[in-house]
């Protein structure tokens, strides 16, 4: 009852603030006010209720039309956007990799080489990173990695298993930054950039910028978990060796999936050479993997593997972000939001580079505390970040990419990710919510600092200079 009352109180306060927000700016036209109001209502529902986040986003997108903040053609075009079909194809590719056993082979094969607990943790971290390119869903990657828990005892008394149950989802989440297809929010960020500036990150560029950061943040998380939750003796404790020879040879299905996946990644990395969009390549891969006699699953099974709820969530969020920009509501919002931290109204141009990077990193990293969805964070903060960059005369692509790296951080509460919930309640014992809070208290500021270091050591020199 107390929690319900607190939730209702939060909704009332938020609604009051929203009403003031919409009524106060007298210089906004009605469509901009409508877009701002719908956006505010969506954020309130995302943060204070248990309503399905995808339903909220989709309903918000539909509500834009009668209020003239978007037109019907934009709504229909949303459902046929190339990002929608890129995600659909990526889900089928991920399902094929997972169902064929290839994902488990990758993680299990590397982890089987471990002789001590510390080696197991480091090798598992290394094995999980490639899954970011293979399976587009964090919960899908978590499900594929769940069997790895069997490498440690499940008697409930071994702290190594508890730490291991924490390590796997944490690495899955921080490694999300490695690939453009690692999360739907990345594709949404690319669409926002395309809408505003006609620019795209591209699969290869994202890997160039995101993979080094993902490797560094994954290594940082592994090192902290080993030191924070295990003693030196526990880290050096031997584990039972699962020899790689115990695993069967590659099946014909695994071979077919490997060939299709390799061809897909090769085409994604060479888009500029052949001209095929990454969404088109994903659809071709989807057709190949579900083709009779060639694929490893039926077309019907492939469609069931697609997370249509997430896809509609991304579609609704895209239209919401587009409406904020087109109606000029985002321009007003960005001045209010970023003025609070000293980078609004173009003032970022006068600040030291390190101060701007730190402000972007702080805002984006902290956003997971009030918006638990990757896509919701990008929909809410993506347009303001782009407009802040434009008003300050700094590079929008760099600002949005760095902000996306910060928005990928979501490790404070289990509710922030299905991957965390899966390992918290893992059969045989998982981690405790307090473990995650302890970890995040140290990892969050270090991850923020890592973003700043990565900018000056790598991003700035590889095409992401402000």
Language-model-derived ranges and their functions:
Residues 111-178, 184-197, 370-406, 429:
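Hydrophobic transmembrane alpha-helices that form the pore/transport pathway of multi-pass ion
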Residues 7-19, 57, 118, 122-127, ...:
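Alpha-helical transmembrane segments
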Residues 22-37, 80-92, 139-141, 213-216, ...:
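Structural signature of hydrophobic alpha-helical transmembrane segments
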Residues 9-10, 31-34, 80-84, 110-126, ...:
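Membrane-interfacial loop-to-helix junctions in multi-pass transporters
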Residues 2-25, 158-162, 166, 174-248, ...:
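Juxtamembrane and boundary regions of transmembrane helices in multi-pass small-molecule transporters
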Residues 26-33, 40-58, 75, 223, ...:
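Flexible hinge motifs at transmembrane-helix junctions and intramembrane kinks/re-entrant loops
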Residues 55, 74-104, 129-134, 300-335, ...:
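Core transmembrane alpha-helical segments of multi-pass membrane transporters/permeases
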Residues 7, 14, 90-97, 115, ...:
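Helix-loop-helix module between adjacent transmembrane segments
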């Amino acid at each position: 009852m107390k929690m319900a009352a607190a939730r209702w109180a939060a909704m009332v306060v938020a609604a009051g603030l929203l009403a003031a927000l919409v009524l106060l700016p007298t210089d906004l036209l009605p469509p901009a006010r409508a877009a701002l109001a719908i956006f505010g209502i969506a954020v309130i529902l995302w943060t204070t209720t248990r309503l399905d986040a995808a339903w909220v986003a989709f309903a918000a997108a539909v509500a834009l039309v009668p209020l003239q903040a978007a037109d019907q053609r934009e709504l229909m075009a949303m459902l046929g956007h190339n990002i929608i079909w890129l995600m659909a194809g990526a889900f089928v590719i991920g399902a094929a990799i997972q169902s064929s056993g290839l994902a488990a082979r990758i993680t299990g094969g590397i982890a089987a080489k471990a002789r001590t607990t510390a080696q197991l943790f480091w090798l598992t971290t290394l094995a999980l990173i490639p899954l970011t390119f293979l399976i587009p869903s964090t919960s899908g990657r978590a499900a594929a990695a769940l069997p790895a828990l069997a490498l440690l005892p499940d008697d409930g008394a071994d702290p190594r298993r508890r730490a291991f149950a924490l390590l796997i989802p944490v690495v899955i989440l921080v490694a999300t930054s490695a690939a453009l297809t690692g999360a739907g929010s990345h594709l949404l960020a690319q669409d926002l950039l395309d809408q505003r500036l006609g620019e795209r990150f591209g699969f290869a560029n994202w890997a160039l910028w995101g993979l080094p950061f993902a490797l560094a943040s994954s290594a940082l998380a592994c090192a902290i978990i080993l030191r924070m939750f295990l003693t030196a003796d526990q880290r050096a404790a031997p584990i039972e060796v699962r020899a790689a020879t115990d695993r069967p040879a590659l099946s014909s299905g695994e071979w077919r999936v490997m060939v299709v996946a390799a061809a897909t990644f090769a085409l994604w990395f060479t888009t500029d050479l052949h001209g095929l969009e990454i969404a088109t390549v994903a659809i071709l891969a989807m057709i190949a993997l579900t083709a009779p006699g060639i694929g490893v699953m039926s077309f019907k099974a492939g469609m069931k593997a697609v997370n249509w709820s997430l896809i509609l969530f991304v579609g609704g969020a895209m239209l919401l972000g587009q409406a904020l920009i087109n109606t000029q509501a985002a321009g007003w919002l960005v001045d209010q939001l970023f003025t609070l931290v000293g980078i609004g109204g173009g003032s970022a141009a006068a600040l030291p580079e390190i101060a701007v990077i730190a402000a972007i990193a702080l805002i984006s990293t902290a956003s997971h505390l009030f918006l638990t969805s990757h896509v919701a964070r990008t929909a809410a903060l993506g347009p303001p970040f782009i407009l802040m960059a434009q008003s300050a005369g700094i590079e929008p692509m760099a600002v949005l990419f760095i902000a996306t790296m910060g928005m990928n951080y979501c490790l404070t509460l289990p509710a922030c990710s299905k991957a965390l919930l899966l390992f918290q309640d893992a059969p045989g014992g998982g981690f405790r919510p307090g473990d995650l809070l302890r970890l995040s208290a140290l990892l969050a500021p270090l991850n923020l600092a890592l973003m700043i270091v990565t900018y000056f050591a790598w991003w700035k020199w590889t095409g992401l200079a402000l």
